[in-house]
């Protein structure tokens, strides 16, 4: 495979070119994917021996290089640092459909790395990287039950679009990424503008039809250049040990799992495990045997939970399959914050805080695409105490960033337009208790927090997590999954939306894929659950508060002639900085002449507005002004008609009589009523006091 081979395919009207055999030849598998002008190098490597772990050590990285967009990194070091939020989300996007495709018991470490080396914003680098990752694994000697593929789907004017361009994405009401193998879907990530469930389902199935075509293209390449898969040692259960353990504790484990309360259940299960482990330790079992014991006990819990759900239709906490845990919510918990909402669902609890800021507080995103700004931000934090544990305290990890982004996508659809509500909005969700579905609880809490803050949301949003237990052709769909069901189940399908439709979807599965029927049933069941949660939330706070918090910034909007913006800013920002220094406000200007003034002090807002209006105020012919004499010359006096604007009162226009010297009539600081009689081509204002005196004289005569 040292010879370079090139394969091409027309993908959504753009060329998809795969190059194999030239680059990164020491990796187990490597391909260069060119999609339009986007180029991604994807590699797959595997350790030579299994790792002594009880899980599959897979790492998937999507890495952006700024040279791909012709940019040099900012800062002092001038090289890429920690991955961007987009890169982290793309890594998760690729990881999720790939992970279920490896054999059970596989413990060799696998790394899949996709480097974006050239970026064309109209040709999705994430989907190119997904195809590249799949192909790198499929042509390698690494055990992999692929290929898989992914596509982006848009929806414009009733039509679905594959891999929409930037312009098309801006018009689309659906932003869907879907992945799977040739038989079924195994990953969904979507944001939408309150789209009905039926349309979302059709979008997913439309995407799967396109996926099948890309997989067929990959299979041709694998058939020609794929390596023979390397034999690897898979961890297998010792059936004799499993039978002994099952006989010793099957009944006790069954009873422990049916304990309703989470911590009590965990303790009961652990007590059964500890008894079995102690018995083997007394027999001085070797390390391999103990490894079998730990694995078999975990498998027993998993199998028993799944059996109870699919056969007995009983969940660990005693709920029905479609039953939601007890709900409660509260707003206005924190006095000095702009808005707060507490949402509790069983033993899952999220407290969200909403902060309002000026438009200048937007987040600037400077990645591979054009520089963008983000006016709404949703951040998710998951401290260790939420599960009653200790652990290292670090910054947000991939999971926290992913959950925050999911909440942001769900809520973004209902954020009011800037013209209606000219604020930057940040919501921070603090998970205080966790027993599953924390990301959806954070969506509910953030909705309440924004309503408490007075954000005029287009509609309230609620989220719910659905689960699946599948045994052969039989399956059970679970509403509002808890932690154990998430961990031991086959699917985590999160659905968020309003009463009108879906605003976000995310699906992770641990099996090969899902059929249309299961997806349709899960979406229908999720809608029923979502409506129930919305009803509970609205009972706490029916609509957004009419007044903002007294501690929130108040924003005043001033519309001026766009040509006058330079006058407000002044040379080198001198004028605008002077206003900010004098009033303590924040000022943001737009190119269309809109100026936003913000501070918590309404008096200072009004003062700043007056200063700006005075700066941009224009004199009009025929208008009268009470002016102040600022400078006297031989030919007349310069009078200030309003702050920042002077006009010339010529010596001949001071009075009806002839004036020999200006000083005979006027002195500095005199205030006199004048009329604008002319504004010349250069914008100079000419004033007259004589006309004012004549008009006063005429009115006096008419009154006689």
Swiss-Prot record:
Q: Where in the cell is it found?
A: Cytoplasm
EC number(s) given by UniProt: 2.7.7.8
Q: Name one GO biological process term.
A: RNA processing
- Record bears the keyword Hydrolase: no
Residue span, KH domain = 553-612
A molecular function (GO) term: magnesium ion binding
Binding residue positions for Mg(2+)? 486, 492
Q: Which UniProt keywords apply?
A: Cytoplasm, Magnesium, Metal-binding, Nucleotidyltransferase, RNA-binding, Transferase
Cofactors demanded by this protein: Mg(2+)
The residues the entry assigns to the signal sequence are: none
Report the residue ranges that make up the S1 motif domain in this protein.
622-690
Broad class of enzyme this protein falls into: transferase
Q: Which InterPro entries match?
A: ExoRNase_PH_dom1, ExoRNase_PH_dom2, ExoRNase_PH_dom2_sf, KH_dom, KH_dom_type_1, KH_dom_type_1_sf, NA-bd_OB-fold, PNPase
Name where it mostly resides: cytoplasm
Q: Name one GO cellular component term.
A: cytosol
As its record notes, the protein acts as a catalyst of: RNA(n+1) + phosphate = RNA(n) + a ribonucleoside 5'-diphosphate
Which SMART domains does the annotation name?
Answer: KH (SM00322), S1 (SM00316)
Give the family, as the similarity comment puts it: Belongs to the polyribonucleotide nucleotidyltransferase family.
Q: Its biological function?
A: Involved in mRNA degradation. Catalyzes the phosphorolysis of single-stranded polyribonucleotides processively in the 3'- to 5'-direction.
Q: Which NCBIfam families match?
A: polynuc_phos (TIGR03591), PRK11824.1 (NF008805)
Protein name listed in UniProt = Polyribonucleotide nucleotidyltransferase
């Amino acid at each position: 495979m040292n010879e370079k081979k090139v394969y091409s395919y027309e993908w959504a009207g753009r060329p998809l070119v795969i190059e194999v055999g030239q680059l990164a030849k020491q990796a187990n598998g490597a391909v260069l994917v060119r999609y339009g002008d986007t180029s991604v190098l994807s590699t797959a490597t595997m350790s030579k021996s299994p790792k002594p772990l009880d899980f599959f050590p897979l790492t998937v990285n999507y890495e952006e290089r700024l040279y791909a967009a012709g940019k040099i990194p900012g800062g002092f070091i001038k090289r890429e640092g920690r991955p961007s939020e987009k890169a982290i989300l793309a890594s998760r996007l690729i990881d999720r459909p790939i992970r279920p495709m490896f054999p059970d018991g596989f413990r060799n470490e696998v790394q899949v790395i996709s480097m974006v080396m050239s970026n064309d914003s109209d040709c999705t680098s994430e989907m190119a990287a997904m195809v590249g990752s799949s192909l790198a694994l499929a042509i390698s000697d690494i055990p992999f039950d692929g290929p898989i593929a992914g596509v982006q789907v848009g929806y414009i004017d009733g039509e679905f679009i594959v891999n929409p361009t930037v312009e098309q994405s801006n018009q689309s009401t659906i932003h869907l990424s879907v992945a799977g193998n040739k038989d079924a879907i195994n990953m969904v990530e979507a944001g939408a503008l309150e789209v009905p469930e039926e349309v979302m389902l059709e979008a997913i199935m439309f995407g799967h039809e396109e996926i099948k075509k890309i997989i067929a293209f990959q299979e041709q390449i694998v058939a020609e250049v794929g390596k023979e898969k390397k034999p690897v040692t898979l961890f297998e259960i010792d059936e004799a040990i499993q039978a002994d353990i099952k006989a010793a504790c099957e009944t006790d484990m069954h009873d422990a799992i049916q304990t309703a309360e989470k911590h009590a259940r965990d303790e009961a299960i652990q007590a059964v495990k500890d008894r079995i482990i102690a018995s083997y330790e007394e027999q001085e079992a070797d390390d391999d045997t103990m490894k079998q014991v730990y694995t078999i006990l975990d498998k027993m819990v998993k199998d028993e939970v799944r059996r109870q759900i699919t056969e007995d239709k009983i969940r660990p906490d005693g709920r029905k399959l479609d039953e939601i845990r007890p709900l409660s919510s509260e707003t206005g918990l924190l006095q000095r914050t702009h808005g707060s909402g507490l949402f509790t669902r069983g033993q899952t609890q999220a407290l969200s805080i909403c902060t309002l800021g000026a438009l200048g507080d937007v987040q600037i995103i400077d990645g591979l695409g054009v520089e963008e700004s983000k006016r709404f931000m949703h951040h998710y934090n998951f401290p260790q105490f939420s599960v009653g544990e200790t652990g290292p305290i670090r910054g947000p990890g991939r999971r926290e960033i992913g959950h925050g982004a999911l909440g942001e996508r769900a809520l973004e659809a209902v954020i009011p337009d800037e013209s209606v509500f000219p604020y930057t909005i940040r919501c921070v969700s603090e998970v205080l208790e966790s027993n599953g579905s924390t990301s959806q609880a954070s969506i509910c809490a953030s909705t309440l927090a924004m309503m408490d803050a007075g954000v005029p949301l287009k509609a309230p949003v609620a989220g719910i997590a659905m689960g699946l237990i599948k045994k052969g052709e039989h399956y059970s769909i679970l509403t509002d999954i808890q932690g154990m069901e998430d961990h031991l189940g086959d699917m985590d399908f999160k659905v968020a939306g309003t009463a009108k439709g879906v605003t976000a979807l995310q699906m992770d599965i641990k099996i090969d894929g899902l059929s249309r029927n299961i997806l349709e049933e899960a979406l229908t069941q999720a809608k029923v659950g979502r409506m129930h949660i919305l009803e509970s939330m609205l009972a706490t706070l029916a609509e957004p508060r009419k007044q903002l918090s007294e501690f929130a910034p108040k924003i005043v909007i001033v519309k001026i002639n766009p040509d006058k913006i330079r006058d407000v800013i002044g040379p080198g920002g001198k004028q605008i900085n002077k206003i900010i220094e004098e009033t303590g406000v924040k000022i943001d200007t737009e190119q269309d002449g809109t100026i936003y003034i913000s501070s918590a002090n309404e008096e200072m807002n009004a003062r700043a507005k007056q200063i700006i209006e005075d700066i941009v105020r224009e004199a009009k012919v025929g208008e009268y002004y009470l002016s102040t004499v600022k400078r006297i010359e031989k030919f007349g006096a310069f009078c200030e008609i309003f702050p920042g604007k002077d006009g010339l009162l010529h010596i001949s226009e001071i009075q009806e009589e002839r004036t020999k010297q200006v000083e005979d009539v006027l002195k500095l600081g005199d205030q006199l009523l004048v009329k604008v009689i002319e504004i010349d081509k250069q914008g100079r204002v000419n004033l007259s006091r004589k006309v004012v005196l004549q008009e006063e004289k005429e009115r006096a005569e008419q009154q006689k």
